[in-house]
């Protein structure tokens, strides 16, 4: 079984993760355009949940397409 995760960059597509990568992750942080464009969002597959830097938000999940882009989620 291989997991389906959304991956950036845009266009954001759900892709099959490589064997051994059984988590989807969402990583968000602010860059210099944060006030006008919002947070930078990185989506992808991982074998282990990426470690979080102090300025980042990282969430991981383990079901197909469980990491949609925050702006694409219904409110």
UniProtKB/Swiss-Prot annotation:
Xref: Pfam families: Toxin_cobra-type
Superkingdom of the source species: Eukaryota
Cysteine disulfide links: 5-24, 17-45, 30-34, 49-60, 61-66
Tissue-by-tissue expression: Expressed by the venom gland.
Keyword DNA damage found: no
GO cellular component: extracellular region
InterPro entries: Snake_3FTx, Snake_toxin-like_sf, Snake_toxin_con_site, Toxin_cobra-type
Keywords in alphabetical order: Acetylcholine receptor inhibiting toxin, Disulfide bond, Ion channel impairing toxin, Neurotoxin, Postsynaptic neurotoxin, Secreted, Signal, Toxin
GO molecular function, one term: ion channel regulator activity
UniProt subcellular location: Secreted
Family: Belongs to the three-finger toxin family. Long-chain subfamily. Type II alpha-neurotoxin sub-subfamily.
Protein name: Alpha-elapitoxin-Bc2b
């Amino acid at each position: 079984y291989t997991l389906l995760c959304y991956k950036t960059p845009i266009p954001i597509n759900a892709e099959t993760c490589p064997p051994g990568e059984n988590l989807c992750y969402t990583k968000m942080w602010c860059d210099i355009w944060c006030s006008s464009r919002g947070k930078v969002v990185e989506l992808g597959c991982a074998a282990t949940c990426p470690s979080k830097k102090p300025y980042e938000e990282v969430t991981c999940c383990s079901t197909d397409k469980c990491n949609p882009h925050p702006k694409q989620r219904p409110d």
